[in-house]
Amino acid sequence: MSLALNPVAFNLGPIQVKWYGILMATGVLVATLMAINEGKKRQIMPDDFIDFLLWAVPIGFIGARIYYVVFEWGYFSQHPDQIIAIWNGGIAIYGGLIAGLIVLLVFCHQRMLPPFLMLDIIAPGVMAAQVIARWGNFMNQEAHGAKTTLSFLESLHLPHFIIQQMYIDGSYYQPTYLYESALNLVGLILILSLRHRKHLFKRGEVFFSYVIWYAAVRFFVEGMRTDSLYIANTIRVSQALSLILFFGAIILWVYRRKVIKPKWYLAGSGLKYPYNRD
């Protein structure tokens, strides 16, 4: 296997630096730069995003690990020494997103920042980070789907290096990481191209759009994966949560449009953008 497909990018003495970590760090960096750039248009200082990042990243990782441990408690209850062994793998993005959301709400309260505005600013960057970080699963040959055939993968007109990386232990597998990354990229392009159109999105609705899109994508892709976390060995956790988020975001969107109409929320309020800070 070529170096480009080796999960280890390089070594620093005894420490292995893996592509997974590099791609995750790249995703965080891209998300931060996107938020800072958009924040300048909304009168949010760059320091606010940096300070938020310093709290959100470590707590997000802790949340991602706790989420995984909770739904794999049958194993970790017998191996408690492995609970903190995050270097062996085992984090769940939904856990990280939930933890990050909690941090954001607390942070906005302390800084007196409008939370839905911050969510609108940050959401596209989070989606971009997800697009990038999923390729870490590709490098690790994990988070894939069921067995498939070489002819099927070739019918997708995938680059040769992707097909070869999907050859694991003598069989080819569905590149579900690629499906999720590609679909999220489509969603990201749509959101970025539409979010500044006047009267299309009110405050909070860029965030709702992200939640609805990602929940739908994750529900679809999760049904193809072979490493899902389960509730009672029957219900896929991520699919159940995706349904809750999908319909929850739609309900909140409609509720805010129909019931809650503060000055900054109304179309034609004279603001440059419907979700500008005021």
From Swiss-Prot:
One protein family per Pfam: LGT
Q: Which residues form a coiled coil?
A: none
Q: Which coarse location class describes where this protein primarily resides? A: membrane
Residues reported to bind a 1,2-diacyl-sn-glycero-3-phospho-(1'-sn-glycerol): 134
Mind telling me which residue stretches traverse the membrane in this protein? Answer: 19-39, 49-69, 83-103, 112-132, 174-194, 204-224, 235-255
Q: What are its GO cellular component terms?
A: plasma membrane
Membrane topology per the record?
Answer: Multi-pass membrane protein
User: Which NCBIfam families does the record match to this protein?
Assistant: lgt
PANTHER family per the UniProt record, alphabetical: PHOSPHATIDYLGLYCEROL--PROLIPOPROTEIN DIACYLGLYCERYL TRANSFERASE, PROLIPOPROTEIN DIACYLGLYCERYL TRANSFERASE
Tell me what this protein is called: Phosphatidylglycerol--prolipoprotein diacylglyceryl transferase
Taxonomy-wise, where does this protein's organism fall, top ranks first?
Bacteria, Bacillati, Bacillota, Bacilli, Lactobacillales
